[in-house]
Protein backbone atom coordinates (compact mmCIF):
# COMPACT_ATOMS: atom_id res chain seq x y z
CA UNK A 1 0.00 0.00 0.00
CA UNK A 2 1.18 3.53 -0.77
CA UNK A 3 1.94 5.91 2.10
CA UNK A 4 -0.34 8.51 0.50
CA UNK A 5 -3.27 6.05 0.67
CA UNK A 6 -2.69 5.53 4.39
CA UNK A 7 -2.69 9.27 5.01
CA UNK A 8 -5.89 10.10 3.10
CA UNK A 9 -7.85 10.82 6.30
CA UNK A 10 -4.94 12.26 8.30
CA UNK A 11 -4.48 16.03 8.53
CA UNK A 12 -0.86 17.13 7.97
CA UNK A 13 1.01 19.96 6.28
CA UNK A 14 4.18 17.91 5.96
CA UNK A 15 5.80 17.33 2.59
CA UNK A 16 6.79 13.68 2.44
CA UNK A 17 8.14 11.13 0.00
CA UNK A 18 5.44 8.73 -1.16
CA UNK A 19 6.48 5.09 -1.03
CA UNK A 20 5.26 1.53 -0.58
CA UNK A 21 4.43 0.56 3.00
CA UNK A 22 4.66 -3.01 4.31
CA UNK A 23 3.25 -2.54 7.82
CA UNK A 24 2.33 -0.01 10.50
CA UNK A 25 3.18 -0.01 14.20
CA UNK A 26 3.45 2.16 17.29
CA UNK A 27 5.63 -0.37 19.12
CA UNK A 28 9.41 -0.05 19.00
CA UNK A 29 9.91 -3.83 19.10
CA UNK A 30 7.76 -4.29 15.97
CA UNK A 31 9.65 -1.93 13.66
CA UNK A 32 10.45 -3.61 10.33
CA UNK A 33 11.80 -2.52 6.97
CA UNK A 34 9.36 -0.36 4.97
CA UNK A 35 6.93 0.03 7.88
CA UNK A 36 5.39 3.26 9.12
CA UNK A 37 6.34 3.95 12.74
CA UNK A 38 3.96 6.14 14.73
CA UNK A 39 5.47 7.95 17.73
CA UNK A 40 3.00 7.91 20.63
CA UNK A 41 3.74 9.43 24.02
CA UNK A 42 2.39 7.20 26.78
CA UNK A 43 2.56 7.36 30.57
CA UNK A 44 5.85 5.48 30.75
CA UNK A 45 7.40 5.65 27.27
CA UNK A 46 7.57 8.23 24.50
CA UNK A 47 7.80 6.77 21.01
CA UNK A 48 9.44 9.98 19.80
CA UNK A 49 12.59 8.90 21.65
CA UNK A 50 13.17 6.02 19.21
CA UNK A 51 12.28 7.82 15.98
CA UNK A 52 15.91 7.89 14.80
CA UNK A 53 16.23 4.20 15.63
CA UNK A 54 13.11 3.47 13.55
CA UNK A 55 14.66 5.27 10.57
CA UNK A 56 17.93 3.34 10.97
CA UNK A 57 15.96 0.06 11.06
CA UNK A 58 14.41 0.83 7.67
CA UNK A 59 11.07 2.46 8.51
CA UNK A 60 9.59 4.01 5.37
CA UNK A 61 8.20 6.97 7.30
CA UNK A 62 7.79 8.21 10.86
CA UNK A 63 4.69 10.02 12.12
CA UNK A 64 5.27 12.39 15.03
CA UNK A 65 3.82 15.38 16.85
CA UNK A 66 6.95 17.52 16.44
CA UNK A 67 10.14 17.67 14.40
CA UNK A 68 12.24 14.60 15.18
CA UNK A 69 14.97 15.09 12.61
CA UNK A 70 14.32 12.08 10.40
CA UNK A 71 14.19 12.22 6.62
CA UNK A 72 10.62 11.11 5.85
CA UNK A 73 8.70 12.53 8.80
CA UNK A 74 5.02 13.45 8.91
CA UNK A 75 3.99 15.91 11.61
CA UNK A 76 0.43 15.71 12.94
CA UNK A 77 -1.45 17.29 15.83
CA UNK A 78 -2.27 13.94 17.47
CA UNK A 79 -0.37 10.75 16.69
CA UNK A 80 -3.00 8.71 18.55
CA UNK A 81 -5.70 10.00 16.22
CA UNK A 82 -3.45 9.52 13.18
CA UNK A 83 -2.58 5.96 14.22
CA UNK A 84 -6.24 5.01 14.53
CA UNK A 85 -6.98 6.42 11.08
CA UNK A 86 -4.02 4.85 9.26
CA UNK A 87 -4.80 1.49 10.89
CA UNK A 88 -8.31 1.74 9.44
CA UNK A 89 -6.90 2.61 6.01
CA UNK A 90 -4.35 -0.22 6.20
CA UNK A 91 -7.17 -2.77 6.59
CA UNK A 92 -9.44 -1.13 4.01
CA UNK A 93 -11.64 0.86 6.42
CA UNK A 94 -13.63 -2.23 7.50
CA UNK A 95 -15.74 -0.39 10.10
CA UNK A 96 -17.47 1.43 7.25
CA UNK A 97 -18.80 -1.95 6.11
CA UNK A 98 -20.19 -2.84 9.56
CA UNK A 99 -22.89 -1.43 11.81
CA UNK A 100 -21.18 -0.67 15.13
CA UNK A 101 -22.94 -0.96 18.50
CA UNK A 102 -20.78 0.33 21.35
CA UNK A 103 -21.42 -0.11 25.08
CA UNK A 104 -19.66 2.00 27.69
CA UNK A 105 -20.03 2.46 31.46
CA UNK A 106 -18.35 1.34 34.66
CA UNK A 107 -20.35 -1.85 35.14
CA UNK A 108 -22.45 -4.06 32.88
CA UNK A 109 -20.56 -3.66 29.60
CA UNK A 110 -19.63 -7.32 29.20
CA UNK A 111 -23.03 -8.76 30.10
CA UNK A 112 -24.86 -6.25 27.93
CA UNK A 113 -22.71 -6.89 24.86
CA UNK A 114 -23.05 -10.67 25.31
CA UNK A 115 -26.82 -10.28 25.58
CA UNK A 116 -27.02 -8.22 22.38
CA UNK A 117 -24.90 -10.89 20.67
CA UNK A 118 -27.21 -13.61 22.01
CA UNK A 119 -30.27 -11.76 20.70
CA UNK A 120 -28.73 -11.35 17.25
CA UNK A 121 -27.70 -15.01 17.19
CA UNK A 122 -31.26 -16.08 18.02
CA UNK A 123 -32.56 -13.83 15.23
CA UNK A 124 -29.97 -15.12 12.73
CA UNK A 125 -28.29 -11.72 12.45
CA UNK A 126 -24.58 -12.40 11.97
CA UNK A 127 -22.46 -10.31 14.31
CA UNK A 128 -19.03 -10.05 15.87
CA UNK A 129 -18.15 -9.31 19.50
CA UNK A 130 -15.28 -7.37 21.04
CA UNK A 131 -14.85 -7.16 24.80
CA UNK A 132 -13.29 -8.12 28.10
CA UNK A 133 -13.86 -11.88 27.99
CA UNK A 134 -13.28 -12.70 24.32
CA UNK A 135 -13.42 -11.44 20.75
CA UNK A 136 -15.62 -13.21 18.18
CA UNK A 137 -15.22 -12.52 14.47
CA UNK A 138 -17.83 -14.79 12.98
CA UNK A 139 -16.53 -18.35 13.28
CA UNK A 140 -13.31 -17.49 15.11
CA UNK A 141 -12.84 -16.69 18.80
CA UNK A 142 -9.87 -15.08 20.55
CA UNK A 143 -9.07 -14.56 24.22
CA UNK A 144 -9.04 -10.85 25.06
CA UNK A 145 -6.17 -8.99 26.68
CA UNK A 146 -7.88 -5.57 26.71
CA UNK A 147 -11.54 -4.56 26.98
CA UNK A 148 -11.08 -2.56 23.77
CA UNK A 149 -8.06 -3.62 21.65
CA UNK A 150 -5.44 -1.17 20.39
CA UNK A 151 -6.18 0.52 17.07
CA UNK A 152 -4.36 -1.96 14.85
CA UNK A 153 -5.83 -5.08 16.46
CA UNK A 154 -9.26 -3.46 16.48
CA UNK A 155 -9.16 -2.81 12.73
CA UNK A 156 -7.85 -6.33 12.09
CA UNK A 157 -10.82 -7.74 14.00
CA UNK A 158 -13.22 -5.52 12.07
CA UNK A 159 -11.71 -6.73 8.79
CA UNK A 160 -12.07 -10.36 9.85
CA UNK A 161 -15.72 -9.75 10.71
CA UNK A 162 -16.34 -8.25 7.28
CA UNK A 163 -14.63 -11.20 5.60
CA UNK A 164 -16.80 -13.65 7.56
CA UNK A 165 -20.02 -11.90 6.58
CA UNK A 166 -20.86 -10.11 9.82
CA UNK A 167 -23.40 -7.31 9.58
CA UNK A 168 -22.86 -5.93 13.08
CA UNK A 169 -19.99 -5.51 15.52
CA UNK A 170 -21.03 -5.31 19.17
CA UNK A 171 -18.25 -4.01 21.36
CA UNK A 172 -17.32 -2.79 24.80
CA UNK A 173 -15.74 0.65 24.59
CA UNK A 174 -13.59 1.43 27.63
CA UNK A 175 -12.81 4.89 28.96
CA UNK A 176 -9.10 4.29 28.33
CA UNK A 177 -9.80 3.37 24.71
CA UNK A 178 -11.79 6.57 24.24
CA UNK A 179 -9.16 8.71 25.96
CA UNK A 180 -6.38 7.13 23.90
CA UNK A 181 -8.20 7.55 20.60
CA UNK A 182 -8.38 3.84 19.77
CA UNK A 183 -11.78 4.31 18.12
CA UNK A 184 -10.99 7.65 16.48
CA UNK A 185 -12.30 7.58 12.93
CA UNK A 186 -14.99 5.02 13.81
CA UNK A 187 -18.66 5.96 13.76
CA UNK A 188 -21.19 4.03 15.86
CA UNK A 189 -24.76 3.38 14.78
CA UNK A 190 -25.85 2.86 18.39
CA UNK A 191 -24.01 3.69 21.63
CA UNK A 192 -25.26 2.56 25.06
CA UNK A 193 -24.45 4.05 28.49
CA UNK A 194 -24.85 1.62 31.41
CA UNK A 195 -23.74 3.62 34.48
CA UNK A 196 -20.88 5.65 35.93
CA UNK A 197 -19.18 5.05 39.28
CA UNK A 198 -15.65 5.33 40.62
CA UNK A 199 -13.09 3.30 38.68
CA UNK A 200 -9.88 3.82 36.70
CA UNK A 201 -9.02 7.07 38.52
CA UNK A 202 -5.42 5.83 38.56
CA UNK A 203 -5.48 6.47 34.81
CA UNK A 204 -7.87 9.41 34.38
CA UNK A 205 -6.83 11.33 37.51
CA UNK A 206 -10.26 12.79 38.28
CA UNK A 207 -13.84 11.62 38.07
CA UNK A 208 -14.56 14.52 35.70
CA UNK A 209 -11.91 13.26 33.26
CA UNK A 210 -13.36 9.75 33.55
CA UNK A 211 -16.87 11.01 32.75
CA UNK A 212 -15.56 13.16 29.91
CA UNK A 213 -13.84 10.14 28.35
CA UNK A 214 -17.06 8.09 28.49
CA UNK A 215 -19.05 10.90 26.89
CA UNK A 216 -16.80 10.87 23.80
CA UNK A 217 -18.58 7.75 22.54
CA UNK A 218 -21.88 9.62 22.26
CA UNK A 219 -20.29 12.34 20.17
CA UNK A 220 -19.47 9.80 17.42
CA UNK A 221 -22.77 7.91 17.17
CA UNK A 222 -26.14 8.22 15.42
CA UNK A 223 -28.27 6.98 18.33
CA UNK A 224 -27.57 7.13 22.07
CA UNK A 225 -29.24 4.74 24.53
CA UNK A 226 -28.97 6.07 28.08
CA UNK A 227 -29.72 4.50 31.48
CA UNK A 228 -31.77 7.39 32.87
CA UNK A 229 -31.67 5.99 36.41
CA UNK A 230 -27.94 6.68 36.68
CA UNK A 231 -27.15 9.97 38.42
CA UNK A 232 -24.65 10.91 35.70
CA UNK A 233 -27.01 10.29 32.78
CA UNK A 234 -27.35 14.05 32.26
CA UNK A 235 -23.59 14.35 31.74
CA UNK A 236 -23.82 11.93 28.83
CA UNK A 237 -26.89 13.40 27.12
CA UNK A 238 -26.34 17.15 27.56
CA UNK A 239 -26.23 18.86 24.13
CA UNK A 240 -25.63 15.64 22.21
CA UNK A 241 -25.87 15.97 18.43
CA UNK A 242 -27.45 12.51 18.03
CA UNK A 243 -30.89 11.05 18.71
CA UNK A 244 -31.28 9.99 22.37
CA UNK A 245 -33.42 7.19 23.82
CA UNK A 246 -33.67 6.57 27.57
CA UNK A 247 -34.53 3.52 29.65
CA UNK A 248 -35.00 2.93 33.36
CA UNK A 249 -36.85 1.34 36.26
CA UNK A 250 -37.30 4.21 38.71
CA UNK A 251 -39.20 6.69 36.54
CA UNK A 252 -41.99 6.67 33.97
CA UNK A 253 -40.39 9.53 32.07
CA UNK A 254 -38.31 7.28 29.78
CA UNK A 255 -38.72 5.87 26.29
CA UNK A 256 -38.37 2.30 27.58
CA UNK A 257 -39.17 1.21 31.15
CA UNK A 258 -39.31 -1.90 33.32
CA UNK A 259 -42.32 -2.58 35.53
CA UNK A 260 -43.35 -5.33 37.95
CA UNK A 261 -39.75 -6.37 38.57
CA UNK A 262 -39.31 -9.62 40.50
CA UNK A 263 -35.93 -11.00 41.55
CA UNK A 264 -35.35 -14.68 42.31
CA UNK A 265 -32.27 -16.64 43.31
CA UNK A 266 -31.66 -17.80 39.74
CA UNK A 267 -33.50 -15.28 37.55
CA UNK A 268 -35.31 -11.97 37.17
CA UNK A 269 -38.71 -11.19 35.67
CA UNK A 270 -40.11 -7.87 34.49
CA UNK A 271 -42.32 -6.22 31.90
CA UNK A 272 -40.56 -4.10 29.27
CA UNK A 273 -42.73 -1.18 28.20
CA UNK A 274 -42.39 1.06 25.16
CA UNK A 275 -44.88 3.65 23.85
CA UNK A 276 -46.23 0.97 21.49
CA UNK A 277 -45.48 -2.43 23.04
CA UNK A 278 -45.26 -4.44 26.23
CA UNK A 279 -43.33 -7.68 26.66
CA UNK A 280 -42.63 -9.95 29.63
CA UNK A 281 -39.01 -10.95 30.12
CA UNK A 282 -37.91 -13.90 32.27
CA UNK A 283 -34.14 -14.22 32.10
CA UNK A 284 -32.06 -16.85 33.89
CA UNK A 285 -29.42 -14.44 35.23
CA UNK A 286 -29.91 -13.41 38.88
CA UNK A 287 -29.49 -9.89 40.26
CA UNK A 288 -31.38 -6.61 39.98
CA UNK A 289 -28.63 -5.25 37.73
CA UNK A 290 -29.69 -7.91 35.20
CA UNK A 291 -32.83 -5.84 34.62
CA UNK A 292 -30.71 -2.91 33.43
CA UNK A 293 -28.30 -5.04 31.41
CA UNK A 294 -31.01 -7.02 29.63
CA UNK A 295 -33.23 -3.98 29.10
CA UNK A 296 -30.33 -2.03 27.56
CA UNK A 297 -29.56 -4.96 25.27
CA UNK A 298 -33.20 -5.31 24.23
CA UNK A 299 -33.49 -1.58 23.49
CA UNK A 300 -30.38 -1.69 21.28
CA UNK A 301 -31.75 -4.65 19.34
CA UNK A 302 -35.14 -2.98 18.82
CA UNK A 303 -33.50 0.26 17.68
CA UNK A 304 -31.35 -1.80 15.29
CA UNK A 305 -34.60 -2.82 13.61
CA UNK A 306 -35.33 -6.21 15.21
CA UNK A 307 -38.93 -7.26 15.80
CA UNK A 308 -40.01 -6.41 19.39
CA UNK A 309 -41.66 -9.75 20.20
CA UNK A 310 -38.70 -11.67 18.76
CA UNK A 311 -36.33 -9.61 20.91
CA UNK A 312 -38.35 -10.31 24.06
CA UNK A 313 -38.24 -14.04 23.31
CA UNK A 314 -34.50 -13.97 22.56
CA UNK A 315 -33.66 -12.07 25.77
CA UNK A 316 -35.61 -14.59 27.83
CA UNK A 317 -33.62 -17.44 26.27
CA UNK A 318 -30.25 -15.79 26.92
CA UNK A 319 -27.71 -17.37 29.24
CA UNK A 320 -25.23 -15.85 31.64
CA UNK A 321 -21.72 -14.61 30.93
CA UNK A 322 -18.58 -16.32 32.26
CA UNK A 323 -17.54 -14.71 35.54
CA UNK A 324 -20.69 -12.62 35.93
CA UNK A 325 -22.79 -13.99 38.81
CA UNK A 326 -21.59 -17.39 37.65
CA UNK A 327 -22.80 -20.34 39.73
CA UNK A 328 -20.03 -22.89 40.30
CA UNK A 329 -21.11 -26.54 40.18
CA UNK A 330 -20.33 -27.76 43.72
CA UNK A 331 -23.11 -30.23 44.64
CA UNK A 332 -23.23 -28.68 48.14
CA UNK A 333 -26.07 -27.25 50.21
CA UNK A 334 -24.50 -23.78 49.90
CA UNK A 335 -23.89 -21.80 46.71
CA UNK A 336 -20.56 -20.60 45.32
CA UNK A 337 -20.72 -17.64 42.94
CA UNK A 338 -17.94 -16.06 40.90
CA UNK A 339 -18.35 -12.42 39.89
CA UNK A 340 -16.08 -9.82 38.31
CA UNK A 341 -17.21 -7.05 40.71
CA UNK A 342 -14.05 -5.03 41.35
CA UNK A 343 -15.33 -1.53 42.02
CA UNK A 344 -17.33 -0.08 44.95
CA UNK A 345 -20.51 0.11 42.89
CA UNK A 346 -19.99 -3.35 41.40
CA UNK A 347 -19.68 -4.92 44.85
CA UNK A 348 -22.67 -3.01 46.18
CA UNK A 349 -24.82 -4.12 43.26
CA UNK A 350 -23.99 -7.80 43.45
CA UNK A 351 -24.17 -8.15 47.25
CA UNK A 352 -27.39 -6.11 47.48
CA UNK A 353 -28.97 -8.27 44.80
CA UNK A 354 -27.90 -11.46 46.57
CA UNK A 355 -29.37 -10.14 49.82
CA UNK A 356 -32.81 -9.98 48.18
CA UNK A 357 -32.84 -13.70 47.40
CA UNK A 358 -30.50 -15.32 49.97
CA UNK A 359 -31.97 -17.00 53.05
CA UNK A 360 -28.60 -17.75 54.62
CA UNK A 361 -25.43 -15.73 55.10
CA UNK A 362 -23.41 -13.97 52.42
CA UNK A 363 -19.71 -14.78 52.73
CA UNK A 364 -17.70 -12.50 50.46
CA UNK A 365 -14.11 -13.19 49.45
CA UNK A 366 -12.56 -10.11 47.84
CA UNK A 367 -9.45 -8.00 47.39
CA UNK A 368 -8.26 -4.96 45.46
CA UNK A 369 -5.92 -4.72 42.49
CA UNK A 370 -2.38 -3.46 42.93
CA UNK A 371 -0.98 -0.51 40.95
CA UNK A 372 -4.52 0.80 40.61
CA UNK A 373 -6.67 3.49 42.24
CA UNK A 374 -5.93 3.26 45.99
CA UNK A 375 -8.81 5.51 47.00
CA UNK A 376 -11.41 2.87 46.19
CA UNK A 377 -9.87 0.25 48.51
CA UNK A 378 -11.38 1.47 51.82
CA UNK A 379 -14.65 2.20 50.01
CA UNK A 380 -14.81 -1.39 48.77
CA UNK A 381 -13.98 -2.60 52.27
CA UNK A 382 -16.77 -0.55 53.82
CA UNK A 383 -19.34 -1.75 51.27
CA UNK A 384 -18.53 -5.42 51.83
CA UNK A 385 -18.31 -4.87 55.59
CA UNK A 386 -21.72 -3.23 55.68
CA UNK A 387 -23.55 -5.56 53.28
CA UNK A 388 -22.04 -9.04 53.76
CA UNK A 389 -22.30 -11.22 56.86
CA UNK A 390 -18.71 -12.42 56.67
CA UNK A 391 -15.93 -10.60 54.78
CA UNK A 392 -12.77 -12.48 53.86
CA UNK A 393 -10.18 -9.92 52.72
CA UNK A 394 -7.52 -11.36 50.44
CA UNK A 395 -5.44 -10.67 47.32
CA UNK A 396 -6.80 -9.91 43.86
CA UNK A 397 -4.07 -9.03 41.34
CA UNK A 398 -1.47 -7.38 43.60
CA UNK A 399 0.92 -6.75 40.71
CA UNK A 400 4.04 -4.95 41.97
CA UNK A 401 2.53 -3.94 45.31
CA UNK A 402 2.88 -5.74 48.63
CA UNK A 403 -0.44 -7.62 49.01
CA UNK A 404 -0.40 -7.18 52.78
CA UNK A 405 -0.32 -3.40 52.37
CA UNK A 406 -3.24 -3.57 49.92
CA UNK A 407 -5.23 -5.55 52.51
CA UNK A 408 -4.32 -2.90 55.09
CA UNK A 409 -5.77 -0.19 52.83
CA UNK A 410 -9.00 -2.21 52.48
CA UNK A 411 -9.31 -2.68 56.25
CA UNK A 412 -9.18 1.10 56.78
CA UNK A 413 -12.76 1.21 55.57
CA UNK A 414 -13.95 -1.68 57.75
CA UNK A 415 -13.28 -0.33 61.25
CA UNK A 416 -16.93 0.02 62.22
CA UNK A 417 -18.65 -2.47 59.94
CA UNK A 418 -21.12 -5.14 61.05
CA UNK A 419 -19.62 -8.11 59.19
CA UNK A 420 -17.23 -10.61 60.72
CA UNK A 421 -13.81 -9.99 59.19
CA UNK A 422 -11.12 -12.51 58.31
CA UNK A 423 -7.89 -11.65 56.50
CA UNK A 424 -6.02 -14.28 54.49
CA UNK A 425 -3.62 -12.79 51.95
CA UNK A 426 -3.35 -16.05 50.00
CA UNK A 427 -6.48 -16.15 47.82
CA UNK A 428 -6.70 -19.95 47.74
CA UNK A 429 -6.57 -20.10 51.53
CA UNK A 430 -9.25 -17.42 51.68
CA UNK A 431 -11.56 -19.38 49.37
CA UNK A 432 -10.94 -22.59 51.32
CA UNK A 433 -11.76 -20.83 54.59
CA UNK A 434 -14.98 -19.35 53.19
CA UNK A 435 -16.15 -22.73 51.93
CA UNK A 436 -15.22 -24.44 55.20
CA UNK A 437 -17.53 -22.19 57.24
CA UNK A 438 -20.41 -22.14 54.74
CA UNK A 439 -23.68 -23.70 55.90
CA UNK A 440 -26.88 -24.72 54.14
CA UNK A 441 -28.47 -21.75 52.39
CA UNK A 442 -25.33 -19.61 52.49
CA UNK A 443 -23.78 -17.94 49.45
CA UNK A 444 -20.00 -17.79 49.05
CA UNK A 445 -19.26 -14.89 46.71
CA UNK A 446 -15.81 -14.87 45.10
CA UNK A 447 -15.58 -11.28 43.90
CA UNK A 448 -13.08 -9.54 41.66
CA UNK A 449 -11.61 -12.03 39.24
CA UNK A 450 -14.66 -13.22 37.34
CA UNK A 451 -13.70 -14.63 33.94
CA UNK A 452 -9.95 -14.24 34.58
CA UNK A 453 -7.93 -17.45 34.65
CA UNK A 454 -4.77 -15.86 35.99
CA UNK A 455 -3.37 -13.87 38.88
CA UNK A 456 -0.80 -11.09 38.47
CA UNK A 457 1.88 -11.12 41.17
CA UNK A 458 5.11 -9.15 41.52
CA UNK A 459 6.84 -12.15 39.93
CA UNK A 460 4.56 -12.11 36.87
CA UNK A 461 1.31 -13.68 35.69
CA UNK A 462 0.41 -17.19 36.90
CA UNK A 463 -2.46 -19.52 35.98
CA UNK A 464 -5.29 -19.12 38.47
CA UNK A 465 -8.83 -20.29 37.75
CA UNK A 466 -11.22 -20.03 40.70
CA UNK A 467 -13.42 -22.78 39.28
CA UNK A 468 -10.45 -25.14 39.45
CA UNK A 469 -9.59 -23.92 42.95
CA UNK A 470 -13.13 -24.62 44.18
CA UNK A 471 -13.13 -28.08 42.56
CA UNK A 472 -9.76 -28.96 44.09
CA UNK A 473 -10.92 -27.83 47.53
CA UNK A 474 -14.00 -30.05 47.28
CA UNK A 475 -11.83 -32.99 46.17
CA UNK A 476 -9.51 -32.47 49.13
CA UNK A 477 -6.53 -31.67 46.93
CA UNK A 478 -6.02 -28.34 48.69
For the regions a protein language model found, what residue spans apply to each?
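N-terminal leader/targeting and accessory segments in enzymes
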Residues: 1-85, 89, 223, 257-262, ...
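Acidic, Mg2+-coordinating active-site environments of NTP-dependent enzymes
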Residues: 5, 64-70, 164, 188-336, ...
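A short acidic, helix-capping loop that chelates divalent metal ions and anchors anionic groups
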Residues: 70-71, 136-142, 198-203, 372, ...
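Phosphate-binding loop of NTP-binding sites
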Residues: 7-10, 83-224, 228, 232-243, ...
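ATP-dependent carboxylate-amine ligase
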Residues: 1-12, 33-36, 46, 241-243, ...
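Short internal beta-strands
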Residues: 60-66, 224-228, 365-366, 389-397
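Short, ordered loop/turn segments at secondary-structure junctions
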Residues: 66-68, 132-133, 175, 196, ...
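Short, well-ordered alpha-helix to beta-strand connector turns
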Residues: 21, 33-34, 59, 70-71, ...
